[in-house]
């Protein structure tokens, strides 16, 4: 009678095999989590950079538009008195004021408005008054262009030299600077805007 030999195959897993599988699974999950977190962080950083770049570009366009459309007429104070200047700028006060032509959908009022740029609470702020000669110092539309601004410097070119205020003397009261420069730091990055007003004539009464 032939001898029958049978083999018993254990289809289950041993405790060691289960533990090894759990360790491998944990490592896979950890690596996947790290990769996912890194991808999300990269996406957030990219999104922030795009937003900052977009904000910078838009702000630059607005500032350049205002300055290139400057109207060379004497400014008045809130009492209607002439200020002996067609543009007033002071790097110490971090402020520049002038009249500019602003596009409007309404034909009921003059397109010439008083525009003011200044550093306020570490932000580059644009104020647009409702007329070229406002009598109410609080009647304006305010726009925060750039936040977290440090070391803002405003300078004005005349006779190939930069000056930190305008007008620099009586001879420059009726003219516009050749160039206007904004230098500032945002998020530890330095930026420089140099804008040409495109006005080479003096105001005459």
Model-derived segments and their meaning:
Residues 1-11:
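N-terminal leader/signal peptides at the extreme start of proteins
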Residues 9-36:
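N-terminal single-pass transmembrane signal-anchor helix
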Residues 40-133:
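Extracytoplasmic beta-strand-rich oligomerization domains located immediately C-terminal to a leader/signal peptide
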Residues 73, 143-156:
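Structured surface patches comprising rigid loops and adjacent beta-strands/short helices at the edges
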Residues 109-114, 139-140, 177:
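Short, surface-exposed coil-to-beta transition loops
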Residues 113-115, 141-143, 189-193:
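Short beta-strand segments
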Residues 131-143:
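Short aromatic-glycine motifs in intrinsically disordered, low-complexity regions
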Residues 150-205:
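Short linear sequence signals and composition-biased patches located at protein termini or domain-edge surfaces
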